[in-house]
Amino acid sequence: MSKIVKVIGREIIDSRGNPTVEAEVHLEGGFVGLAAAPSGASTGSREALELRDGDKSRFLGKGVTKAVAAVNGPIAQAVLGKDAKDQANIDKIMIDLDGTENKSQFGANAILAVSLAAAKAAAASKGLPLYAHIAELNGTPGKYSMPLPMMNIINGGEHADNNVDIQEFMIQPVGAKTLKEAIRMGSEVFHTLAKVLKSKGMGTAVGDEGGYAPNLGSNAEALAVIAEAVKAAGYELGKDITLAMDCAASEFYKDGKYVLAGEGNKSFTSEEFTHFLEDLTKQYPIVSIEDGLDESDWAGFAYQTKVLGDKIQLVGDDLFVTNTKILKEGIDKGIANSILIKFNQIGSLTETLAAIKMAKDAGYTAVISHRSGETEDATIADLAVGTAAGQIKTGSMSRSDRVAKYNQLIRIEEALGDSAPFNGLKEVKGQ
């Protein structure tokens, strides 16, 4: 009943109005899985390749008809007749057929869409929710937890058209007892922040991930206005709400220096920028910092881990790109203590699960993440619960492409009840 009988690829539109790949996988029992590939803006240089057409006369070169053709042609032919429940085999067939290190033949966007659609179809054929099927694929059947959200309420960097260098300023509702309560707390702070920004004459337009994107005098000012909003919403900073940042430092790394254009082109060495971040953690309850240095600055990361790693969660995104080879090197060298997990950085569900397992086995945490270009596909919610990853980044409290994931988490928590605990701050490395 789980044999693949049809695969359909199509070009759809993501949350930025750019094309992306959607795949349908049909099984002989009439079961269907539907999944879409997300797309990043600030991308690591070692990510699996997102195949774009490059035809400037169509979607400004961002079309994905080549990737869709790969789904409808060679990929479909290769997986027809195969058992969708054997996820590792489905993924291996596609990866081997592509034959490149970075999936550049078919595109990670093509392979990932089929990989996730096959998993959804297989879950349906087993009569299981997707999170339960993922837990079985993960070798941890029935072991679930609800993730602590990192809510990106001020957007900067590549995610917004403003003067803020650091890409994401996030809140974590650690005082919540349930995921649903965490979402309520996040929503209240988000709306209160709008009032705070308006009272200061600042804009409340939102960025790619649904957070506000005001022009600010400094990166520290973003933390200050969030702190004000937390208090005005009736919460205590550090007890009810903690803070997290994604520096995406590769985006402002120039000629061996970290240059903050929004602060008058202030320039820092790796060590200086580490201490700049350390000073912020002394002023505010920041418990997690992502990509605090450039992805290639491993010597700097070793220093940053030495200085901050025993008290702050240091998350590698561009640094590790959900790649087990790179992650293993980082673990061996004591670089960072957490990995950001993005399906499309590596391009298949099987490889994603391997990265989560490797991180956990090494004592690193794993933070499941969206991309800045998203769709209504909420698979990452099921991934977070099904692997008991413990943390999720899926944007702010606006934009349907972000809220779709929160709503799926609410549904899952309702279905699982006490069998999926919400552990709050305990999930964060160093806390």
Curated annotation (Swiss-Prot):
Catalytic reactions of this protein: (2R)-2-phosphoglycerate = phosphoenolpyruvate + H2O
UniProt main location, coarse: cytoplasm
What is the main EC category here?
lyase
Q: Name one GO molecular function term.
A: magnesium ion binding
Positions bound to Mg(2+): D246, E290, D317
Documented EC number(s): 4.2.1.11
**InterPro entries annotated for this entry?**
Enolase (IPR000941), Enolase-like_C_sf (IPR036849), Enolase-like_N (IPR029017), Enolase_C (IPR020810), Enolase_CS (IPR020809), Enolase_N (IPR020811)
Q: Report the co-factor binding details.
A: Binds a second Mg(2+) ion via substrate during catalysis.
- Which pathway? Carbohydrate degradation; glycolysis; pyruvate from D-glyceraldehyde 3-phosphate: step 4/5
Q: Which residues form the active site?
A: E209, K342
Summarize where (2R)-2-phosphoglycerate binds, as residue positions.
Answer: Q167, K342, R371, S372, K393
Q: Signal peptide location in the record? A: none
One Gene Ontology cellular component annotation?
cell surface
Q: According to its UniProt record, where is this protein located?
A: Cytoplasm; Secreted; Cell surface
Q: Which cofactor does it need?
A: Mg(2+)
The protein's UniProt keywords, in alphabetical order, are: Cytoplasm, Glycolysis, Lyase, Magnesium, Metal-binding, Secreted
Q: Which GO terms describe its biological process?
A: glycolytic process
Family per UniProt? Belongs to the enolase family.
UniProt subunit comment:
Component of the RNA degradosome, a multiprotein complex involved in RNA processing and mRNA degradation.
Q: Which NCBIfam families match?
A: eno
Q: What does this protein do?
A: Catalyzes the reversible conversion of 2-phosphoglycerate (2-PG) into phosphoenolpyruvate (PEP). It is essential for the degradation of carbohydrates via glycolysis.
Q: Give the protein name, as stated in the record.
A: Enolase
Instruction: State the organism of origin.
Output: Pectobacterium atrosepticum (strain SCRI 1043 / ATCC BAA-672) (Erwinia carotovora subsp. atroseptica)
